[in-house]
Amino acid sequence: MKELALKYGCNPNQKPSRIYMDDDRDLPIEVLSGRPGYINFLDAFNGWQLVRELKAATGLPAATSFKHVSPAGAAVGLPLDETLRKIYWVDDMGELSPLACAYARARGADRMSSFGDFIALSDVCDKDTASLIKREVSDGVIAPGFTDEALEILKAKKKGNYCVIKIDENYRPAPLEHKQVFGITFEQGRQELPIDDELLSNVVTENKEIPEAAKRDLKIALITLKYTPSNSVCFVKDGQAIGVGAGQQSRVHCTRLAGQKADNWFLRQCPKVLDLQFVDGIRRADRDNAIDVYIGEEYMDVLADGAWEKIFKVKPEVFTREEKRAWLDQMKGVTLGSDAFFPFSDNIERAHKSGVEYIAEPGGSVRDDAVIECCNKYNMAMAFTGIRLFHH
């Protein structure tokens, strides 16, 4: 198959639409179920590159959750502790495969943003992973293969309309890539820089110690940034992105956005949130929305009389700003990657509030000294990678 007609492009009025190969090769995919659209394929192909690189860099199964050509989450298949199983709503599923753990992490980090996601998996989709996907609102999945049991589960989703794409894991694109804007063709070499330990070797702070687990997490952050619209900043902890700040014109706004998402991830683990008693039969999305509001500044939207009764069995106490700050002060060992240099130390100040201890960024700002000095103030270890990772 050298081309595939699509229903429409980005919007319903943008017709005709198709994906195709410029050379004489066949498309490296097979659509096993559903009818993926233009944006689905953009998510799928960006996501597939991300998880393929995560697997190569870490040796672990990887998953990502994409929305509008940007990763809401990305993770490798480390085991889940009981708290994470609870906040990812998988505590009733028994032991999960490494690939299923990777998707539980990728989906669970920012569940609000992952609603209706497109999933990419580095490995053959197994029954555990398919069973997890079955429970979530999602548009589709791309993987190098599917077990018979997994495919049966996924084909039954959305009344048979769930998009399932098999990709040839041996496919490699041409070294030059092209895109058109306003009828004008742009050409560039593909971004094929390997993200490895060597990239993290130039540690410019007084603290030179970056443990192996932090190196793994920094590589996850940088690989995630390779496929995130710029400007972008990514917070990672324990093998998963916990906050992705994407597509902001201001670097510090990226850091604030990603930091707030990371804070929300950690706040969801607080006993005060874990102990919330929801009404029977509440939908997963409504539960996610209620938690997001409860831990935020608009908490009275779910605690006001006439509102809380629809969500909770027992009216929760207010989660005060002081209580939240005290809980967040316990967050440690977080890593941070940035797709370009930090122009001001305000980014470091904000990162510190979310438990960041390890940073990777290109360096090259005229204010590098001020940024390094701020890192030293908090005993952070920061590596200058010397490479920018813009994605447009």
Ranges and model annotations:
Residues 72-112, 242-341:
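Glycine- and Gly-Pro-enriched alpha-helical subdomains that act as flexible
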Residues 117, 121-122, 135-165, 170-172, ...:
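C-terminal binding/interaction regions
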Residues 1-199, 214-232:
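Active-site loops and adjacent core secondary-structure elements that bind or stabilize anionic groups
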Residues 124, 203-213, 342:
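Bateman/CBS regulatory modules and CBS-like beta-alpha motifs in cytosolic regions of diverse proteins
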Residues 70, 125, 237-240, 248, ...:
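Active-site-proximal loop/turn and secondary-structure-junction residues that shape catalytic pockets
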Residues 57-65, 164-167, 230-237, 267-278, ...:
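Flexible, glycine/charged-enriched surface loops at secondary-structure junctions
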Residues 175-210, 268-288:
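Substrate-contacting helices/loops that form the catalytic groove of nucleic-acid
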Residues 53, 227, 264-268, 353, ...:
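Conserved helix-loop functional segments at active or binding sites
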